[in-house]
Regions:
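A glycine-centered beta->alpha junction motif in the catalytic cores
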Residues: 21, 29-43, 80, 190-208
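Active-site Asp-x-Gly
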Residues: 111-113, 126-172
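Short, glycine/acidic-enriched loop or turn micro-motifs at the edges of active sites
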Residues: 36, 118-120, 138, 150
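Helix-rich C-terminal or lid/interface subdomains of diverse kinases
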Residues: 150-211
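Conserved Rossmann-like nucleotide-binding pocket used by diverse enzymes
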Residues: 11, 114, 119
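ATP-binding pocket architecture of kinase catalytic cores
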Residues: 1-72
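An alpha-helical support segment within catalytic cores of ATP-dependent transferases
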Residues: 20-23, 46, 58-116, 127, ...
Length: 211
């Protein structure tokens, strides 16, 4: 994945050395360049950060489509057709209906390179600008709406629904390739992450009640 990104304008780390079998380092090891910056603090300058996150995602999604032959295809983390409502839910019937909808045939939509875990904590910012995008472990070829949905879910539980709506609006303002199936993939993303989630494992600022 990082070799592919090195040929693109995406600000990702570059590979310095790799020992995937652990022959030298005893464990699988990857050494990369260090990117400048730190994860952004959204509440301070929310609009500016969200715009940069939206612009960067457009760059990711525009990576040469030859990538489809070099990376795995998108797949959900869990089998939504056999998933059950979260044990902590107070409205299991609502979750059952959501799972029914998410298990339907995915709607057609643009496919491209996706980060698969795109959210503020996997980006870096330096001197007021986005300086890097990290953690490409789950990178794959799939619906553009998956990355948007993943960002929106993280923004919703960390900062509220207004932040999630703002990101979608900004993304749509900087690209002509707009997924028409966003609500479906928002639902799939949420269920894929939350059905087996223990709320106690979330960072303190994450509040599922915001959903």
């Amino acid at each position: 994945m990082l070799e592919l990104l090195a040929e693109s304008p995406v600000p990702a780390p570059c590979i310095v050395a790799a020992d995937p079998a652990g022959a030298v380092c005893d464990v699988p090891t990857l050494l990369t360049t260090r990117l400048p910056g730190h994860p952004p603090g959204l509440p301070h300058d929310m609009d500016a950060v969200l715009m940069q996150l939206a612009e960067a995602l457009v760059v990711i999604h525009a990576v040469d489509d030859r990538a489809t032959k070099r990376i795995p295809g998108y797949r959900t983390y869990i089998d939504l057709t056999s998933a059950a409502p979260p044990r902590w839910s107070r409205r299991p019937q609502l979750w059952e209906r959501a799972l029914e909808l998410a298990s339907a045939q995915p709607p057609p939509g643009p496919r491209c390179l996706i980060h698969r875990d795109y959210h503020p904590e996997n980006t870096l910012r330096s001197r007021g600008r986005l300086s890097g995008i990290v953690d490409w472990t789950s990178g794959s070829w799939g619906p553009a709406a998956v990355d948007i949905g993943h960002m929106r879910w993280n923004l919703a539980v960390a900062y509220g629904l207004d932040a999630a709506a703002a990101f979608l609006r900004l993304y749509r303002s900087v690209t002509s390739v707009v997924p028409e199936d966003q609500h479906y993939w928002d639902l799939v993303t949420l269920l894929d992450l939350v059905c087996n989630l223990d709320p106690h494992d979330l960072p303190p600022r994450f509040d599922l009640a915001r959903l």
